[in-house]
Amino acid sequence: MGRHYEIVLLVHPDQSEQVQAMLERYKALIENGHGKIHRLEDWGRRQLAYPIQKLVKAHYLMMNIEVEQSVLNELVDLFRFNDAILRHLAIKRSGPDTEQSFIMKSKDDKGDKPERRRRDDDENGDVGVSNDSDNDGGNAEAA
């Protein structure tokens, strides 16, 4: 059949509504080229490590596919000429990867964890407030 690839896409956050339509178009291209999609994950909007085109967030997608080189070339051309896709990366893999990704596992685990306490959440609620009456020292008399 074909070779195995892992593809990660960063989609412009304003285009999040069109992500499903984009995925359907890519799925059709892969399946028409006699390819298989082993894994498809929508990671949602996530913080970028650095700004891309003055954006700090993007919609992440990840696919593990098995296709011929010609189909991959068509996909990469679609990614390259689609203004909604900020970045794309296609990596050749040794075999199919159907296990859930680390990001999706950690996303699932977050629902089980209790909410973390912030530093400014103290039991009495007055962190950083001093009870000293001489803080305003002679400022009131000087006015």
Curated annotation (Swiss-Prot):
TM stretches of this protein: none
Record's protein name: Small ribosomal subunit protein bS6
Basic and acidic residues composition-biased segments: 105-121
Keyword Ribosomal protein in record: yes
GO MF, one example: structural constituent of ribosome
HAMAP family, per the entry: Ribosomal_bS6
NCBIfam families: S6
Region (Disordered): 95-143
CDD domains: bS6
Alphabetical keyword list: Ribonucleoprotein, Ribosomal protein, RNA-binding, rRNA-binding
GO CC annotations on file: cytosolic small ribosomal subunit
Pfam families membership: Ribosomal_S6 (PF01250)
Family: Belongs to the bacterial ribosomal protein bS6 family.
General function of this protein: Binds together with bS18 to 16S ribosomal RNA.
GO biological process, one term: translation
InterPro entries linked: Ribosomal_bS6, Ribosomal_bS6_sf, Ribosomal_S6_plastid/chlpt, Transl_elong_EF1B/ribsomal_bS6
PANTHER family: MITOCHONDRIAL 28S RIBOSOMAL PROTEIN S6, SMALL RIBOSOMAL SUBUNIT PROTEIN BS6M
